């Protein structure tokens, strides 16, 4: 019976299972393992199952909340971009980039760059720009302003577009800043697929024509070359949606008004405008020409303009000994491994100092605006790759240039404007690092130093004449104005004079640099009259050694220096009338009587001078404004901007009782008193572009009323005024440029005829590019067959242009993609998504598990090796 018993239909045992059943079981196991390791895309079925369970619990009468579907009855389509941004935002409170609702490619570029937490200016500006508002933003140097306008630009453009024309435009004042912006654009937008074109002066225009023919999404340019290319190509910027003015105040003040007007005239009406700089005035009437529409003002770090990690030192030296002091600083004060940037006034100073320092063994390079573009790139690359330790530049590199691992800045020529000082010293102490700024101040530059401290709201600290090194270190070296020991100047100057006597080239460069210094002194803006008056009151002859040098000398050397200073400052108490005169001499008696009469006046004068020397040289006292005046200032700012972010909050004083007593003792009626200048007058005057409130001539020029004549002769009379030229010894035109030819652009403005030289037409003929392929010829229905340019031609003449003659007029390159191109593009996009979410790792892990299961199963035979078809499947 046992032998004849039939087996039931239950599951067979493992050794006797058929191969086709094993294959089905393996598929089920593989599907289960994939379900465990799948990402969020494969979890839709689990979510649907949970929703079904919740629906069964709620009952048939209640519906679950869900996103609006495409079958909605509303006439307005749902804004999917806002929904995606809301979905991307973190539900919990977070201060990182996750809470801004950025798309995945943009967020991945941020993480790849290494940014974790946004800076204060990024946290304030990025959400406002994402809302589509015009923004005017100001924050101190090194605070991450470049990412503030790049990240919203990537989020707005999303991905590569098939439409013709650029959609974003970034304008920079200098080529180096544009190159740096291009570098950050490539790094942050690595995963967006956006194409960028760089339009810079000094590069070949043919390469820029080719770059614009590739239909870029973003154009990064300097204004002069962009206008040149736009006029040559008859370029239309009607598709631009997003415009950035980087270092906006520098763009509007360095003579780009004509170019900027032409660029703004080519832009469409509904574009978004963003202005960024480290120094921006509060009332941006000067930037009205940028086309701002209900802008939002964001000003951070208005009070603390300098970084806390930045240390400043001011050295009082003569103009002819600055080179010697610079050499001493580079060889003895600055560490050998540190990198230093030296700012000079003109390109002649840069060439002279480069040759001089190279002869003394200091490795250096120089950059100025007139230098060839290739040489500028080479010298900057040498400095950034630590091939040389010193870079001598003009104010070209003061704006926005981010040089990594920069430790020191030396102002060889002291800046004439406070905001220029901010941009210069802002090259160091960036992104949390520390740095030092040394400034060489000549006696005629002391008023500019006082103007700078008025602008910063700080006090000038003078070095004490006879101060011990321990006391000087305790007081601190930050912001101290002091002398340089004469022994240091003599030692370094002797070596420089020896080197100059042995080189005729150095002598010629030195002579040219001196002439350039005289031209610079005549052309630089004048300081304020208050600072000139206060500079005359300072007793610079009694100025002590700077703590930077007093700590480097021994006590014996310091005593010798003090003795030399006391001999130099010695003044006898007797006059010429009392020398070799007896007590009964009339001249001696007269001087004694005069000294007795003026004794009190002399004593009071000496006492006031002693008090001035003991106390710090404070800037002009900041007057406390009443509450009504502060409210009036806030209303003035809010009248210009729709929203103001980062206003200065009222901080309570240290002693409210003392302030109340001072208010009671004032002899002015606060209800009717109107101040003649606002509280932040000095700060805003330093930030101003046109220098309003500065020189008297500028104020007078603004108050002049120009009346137009009522006849053609009277209208042109003002343009024909002559002016005497001292060099030419004759009368010349007021501007001296009347003989230059002008051309009229599409926007109606007249620009120089040098912008139109038919370079683009020559390039198209050289590259064999047909005019009908370009976007300027009109829509596609006008590109049909028709007569060619030039009339009838023979067959032999047509062979000189092979492309134009070989392509028939009716067969043009179609912009519609074929089925194969669409499938190929979809496969590439699917492959990119597969790789971005880690599909390659999942696939390799799945293959390893499959191979392991096959080795364990082995079809019940236990053989370790596989042959034939099974081996191919593995």
Curated annotation (Swiss-Prot):
E.C. number, please?
Answer: 3.6.4.13
- Coiled-coil residues: none
* Major localization class: nucleus
Q: Does the keyword Transmembrane helix apply?
A: no
Q: Which GO terms describe its molecular function?
A: ATP binding; ATP hydrolysis activity; nuclear estrogen receptor binding; RNA binding; RNA helicase activity; signaling receptor binding; transcription corepressor activity
The Helicase C-terminal domain, residue ranges: 328-472
Asked if Protease is a keyword of the record, the answer is no
Sequence positions bearing Phosphothreonine: 30
Keywords, A to Z, come to: ATP-binding, Helicase, Hydrolase, Nucleotide-binding, Nucleus, Phosphoprotein, RNA-binding, Transcription, Transcription regulation
Give the Polar residues compositional bias ranges. Answer: 581-590, 713-722
Compositional bias of kind Basic and acidic residues:
664-685, 737-747, 755-771, 812-823
Which ranges carry the Helicase ATP-binding domain? 126-298
Q: Which Gene3D superfamilies match?
A: P-loop containing nucleotide triphosphate hydrolases (3.40.50.300)
Where do Low complexity bias regions lie?
636-645
UniProt biased composition (Basic residues): 20-30, 864-874
Please give the function described in this protein's UniProt entry: Has RNA-dependent ATPase activity. Represses the transcriptional activity of nuclear receptors.
Q: What is this protein called?
A: ATP-dependent RNA helicase DDX54
**Source species, please?**
Mus musculus (Mouse)
Q: Which gene encodes it?
A: Ddx54
């Amino acid at each position: 019976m046992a032998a004849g018993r039939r087996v039931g239909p239950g599951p067979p045992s493992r050794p006797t299972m058929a191969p086709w059943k094993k294959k089905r079981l393996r598929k089920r196991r593989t599907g289960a393992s994939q379900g465990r390791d799948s990402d969020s895309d494969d979890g839709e079925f689990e979510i649907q199952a949970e929703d079904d369970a919740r629906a069964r619990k709620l009952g048939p009468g209640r519906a679950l909340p869900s996103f609006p579907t495409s079958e909605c009855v509303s006439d307005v389509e749902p804004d999917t971009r806002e929904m995606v941004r809301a979905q991307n935002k973190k539900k919990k409170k977070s201060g990182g980039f996750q809470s801004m609702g950025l798309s995945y490619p943009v967020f991945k570029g941020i993480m790849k760059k290494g940014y974790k937490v946004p800076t204060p200016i990024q946290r304030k500006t990025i959400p406002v720009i994402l809302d589509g508002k015009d923004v005017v933003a100001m924050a101190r140097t090194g605070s991450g302003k470049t990412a503030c306008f790049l990240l919203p630009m990537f989020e707005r453009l999303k991905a590569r577009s098939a439409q013709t024309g650029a959609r974003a435009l970034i304008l920079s004042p200098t080529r180096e800043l544009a190159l740096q912006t291009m570098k950050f654009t490539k790094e942050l937008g690595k995963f967006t697929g956006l194409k960028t074109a760089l339009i810079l002066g000094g590069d070949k225009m043919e390469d820029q024509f080719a770059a614009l023919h590739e239909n870029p999404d973003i154009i990064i340019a300097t204004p002069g070359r962009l206008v040149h290319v736009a006029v040559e190509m008859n370029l239309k910027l009607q598709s631009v949606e997003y415009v950035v003015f980087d270092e906006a105040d520098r763009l509007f003040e360095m003579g780009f008004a004509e170019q900027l007007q032409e660029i703004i005239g080519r832009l469409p009406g509904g574009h978004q405008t963003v202005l960024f700089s480290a120094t921006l005035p509060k009332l941006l009437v000067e930037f009205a020409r940028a086309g701002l529409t209900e802008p939002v003002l964001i000003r951070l770090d208005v009070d603390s303009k300098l970084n806390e990690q930045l240390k400043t030192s001011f050295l009082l030296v003569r103009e002819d000994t600055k080179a010697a002091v610079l050499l001493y600083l580079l060889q003895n004060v600055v560490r050998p491994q540190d990198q230093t940037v030296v700012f000079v006034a003109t390109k002649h100073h840069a060439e002279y100092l480069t040759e001089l320092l190279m002869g003394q063994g200091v490795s250096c390079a120089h950059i100025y605006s007139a230098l060839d573009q290739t040489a500028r790139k080479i010298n900057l690359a040498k400095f950034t790759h630590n091939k040389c330790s010193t870079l001598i530049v003009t104010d070209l590199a003061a704006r926005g240039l981010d040089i990594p691992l920069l430790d020191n800045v030396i102002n060889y020529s002291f800046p004439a404007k406070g905001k220029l000082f901010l941009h210069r010293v802002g090259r160091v102490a960036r992104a949390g690092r520390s740095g030092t700024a040394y400034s060489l101040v000549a006696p005629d530059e002391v008023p500019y130093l006082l103007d700078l401290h008025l602008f910063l709201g700080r006090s000038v600290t003078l070095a004490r004449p006879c101060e011990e090194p321990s006391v000087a270190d305790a007081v601190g070296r930050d912001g101290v104005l002091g002398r340089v020991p004469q022994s240091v100047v003599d030692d370094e100057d002797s070596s420089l004079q020896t080197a100059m006597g042995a080189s005729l080239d150095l002598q010629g460069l030195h002579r040219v640099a001196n002439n350039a210094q005289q031209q610079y002194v005549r052309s630089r803006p004048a300081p304020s009259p208050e600072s000139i008056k206060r500079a005359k009151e300072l007793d610079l002859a009694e100025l002590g050694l700077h703590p930077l040098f007093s700590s480097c000398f021994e006590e014996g050397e310091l005593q010798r220096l003090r003795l030399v200073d006391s001999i130099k400052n010695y003044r006898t108490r007797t006059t010429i009338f009392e020398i070799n005169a007896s007590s009964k001499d009339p001249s001696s008696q007269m001087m004694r009587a005069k000294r007795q009469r003026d004794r009190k006046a002399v004593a009071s004068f000496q006492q006031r001078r002693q008090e001035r020397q003991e106390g710090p040289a404070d800037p002009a006292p900041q007057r406390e404004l009443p509450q009504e005046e502060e409210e009036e200032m806030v209303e003035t700012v809010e009248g210009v901007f729709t929203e103001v972010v980062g206003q200065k909050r009222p901080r309570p004083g240290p002693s409210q009782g003392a302030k109340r007593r001072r208010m009671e003792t004032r002899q002015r009626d606060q209800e009717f008193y109107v101040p003649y200048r606002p509280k932040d007058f000095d700060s805003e005057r330093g930030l101003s572009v046109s220098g309003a409130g500065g020189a008297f001539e500028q104020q007078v020029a603004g108050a002049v009323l120009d009346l137009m004549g009522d006849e053609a002769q009277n209208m042109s009379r003002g343009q024909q005024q002559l002016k005497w030229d001292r060099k030419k010894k004759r009368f010349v035109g007021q501007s001296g440029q009347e003989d230059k030819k002008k051309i009229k652009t599409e926007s109606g403005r007249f620009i120089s005829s040098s912008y139109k030289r038919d370079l683009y037409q020559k390039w198209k003929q050289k590259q064999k590019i047909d005019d009908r392929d370009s976007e300027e010829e009109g829509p596609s229905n006008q590109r049909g067959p028709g007569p060619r340019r030039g009339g009838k031609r023979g067959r032999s003449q047509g062979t000189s242009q092979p492309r134009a003659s070989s392509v028939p007029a009716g067969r043009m390159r179609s912009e519609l993609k074929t089925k194969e191109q669409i499938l190929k593009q979809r496969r590439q996009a699917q492959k990119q998504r597969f790789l971005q979410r880690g599909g390659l790792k999942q696939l390799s892990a799945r293959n390893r598990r499959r191979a392991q299961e096959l080795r364990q199963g082995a079809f019940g035979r236990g053989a370790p090796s596989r042959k034939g078809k099974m081996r191919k499947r593995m």
